[in-house]
């Protein structure tokens, strides 16, 4: 089955921050159907909406910092409603809010609140996982506890299949677990094993030590993920959008070249 394919703009953030319109135009030429935002790079919602309309890209979703949505949910989310986003996502939890800390129950309550505000504005809240949500609490993954605790009409999944794999689960099987609750899925490829310094690789936490293993993000189709099987699971799970994400470029390629390789590979397997 052919799915519309978007790209998480964080993957090409340097180019987008310098020239969003030109970058979006090149992404459209590569065959991308939509974009998922990670900031607006100084543009107004109206300007971004007009860019997408002019180029023919669907502004499908946005990653919005958790704490920003907690502090001013309606004000922050309204910007993305004005752009035309169907979804907004909690992209990442800093250490003090993660599973296993005293503040994780607070996160669950806030996610319910944010989901209600998003629904009021005509959008659906998603949660984008990393590997740390695969911590078990009383025998259950924290990620599963989150989805059990928040009603489906207030929260849907945005499973990042790289991090599902790193977290110790089979990406296809875990995606199928959320059949009917997985409108958007992140396709991300990688090689190597889990590093003690994973989050330096996604540009969020900087530490002095180098990664202890040769973990590297790759263009989709150029790593260890089984995407033909994942694509079948994507269809069975009822997903409606595939989103490509590559946190850091690799293989000696630029971020835009990596984006092009990912899209070309997905076309080659019928997506």
Predicted feature residues:
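Acidic-and-aromatic substrate-binding clefts and catalytic sites of carbohydrate-active enzymes
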Residues: 12-18, 34-47, 64-72, 95-99, ...
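Conserved beta-strand positions in the central sheet of alpha/beta enzyme cores
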Residues: 36, 61, 89, 126, ...
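A short, acidic, amphipathic alpha-helical segment used as a generic capping/interface helix at domain edges
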Residues: 222-235
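Active-site acidic/histidine proton-transfer and metal-coordination neighborhood
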Residues: 25, 34, 66-157, 177, ...
